[in-house]
Amino acid sequence: MSTIKPSVAEKFAEHLPYHRPLAEIESVAVEMGSSPTDDGVVEMIVCRPHTDERRVLDEGVLDVSHGLIGDSWETRGADDGGPDPLRQITVMNSRILASIAGNRDRWQLAGDQLIVDLDLSIASLPAGTRLQIGDAVAEVTEPPHTGCSKFAGRFGADALAWANGPGGRRQRRRGMHVRVLVSGKVRRGDAIRKVA
């Protein structure tokens, strides 16, 4: 398990110097090719214990009531002040993230708990689709996952525009939300697949 925990400025300074321009992001994305549509792999598990803190885990527990155990999801409020069950876990495609972030050491900065090699597009995984993720089962939820100013600060304005543009939204380049239906362990390298 690795943790980024110094001050916010120190923490992200080593990761910030390079923002890929749009042409490079698009070129790398084409070169990376398409992710599988049915049987994918969990590439990275990232816990966010506190704001701007990341822990890369070899194994985690996805819990129906608490999301990723140890993550701060429950403190990231919905409109009513409580946790938003439709935004319990965020999932991002590893090939898309590699196109944007480059070095794997920077992937955790995206802030998504699960980085996976699976086609996350709306056409492939409409809301309501169930996924087996390691020993857990989760359901794709409706709310879009869009990039924010932190994402732009870490990866650049071109990355944010590419992720949030019309094609980006259809492909869910910025990722998607799921909620846990059946608690269970998830490990790096575990399968992620559609449940019939």
Model-derived features with residue positions:
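Metal-cofactor-dependent catalytic cores
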Residues: 1-196
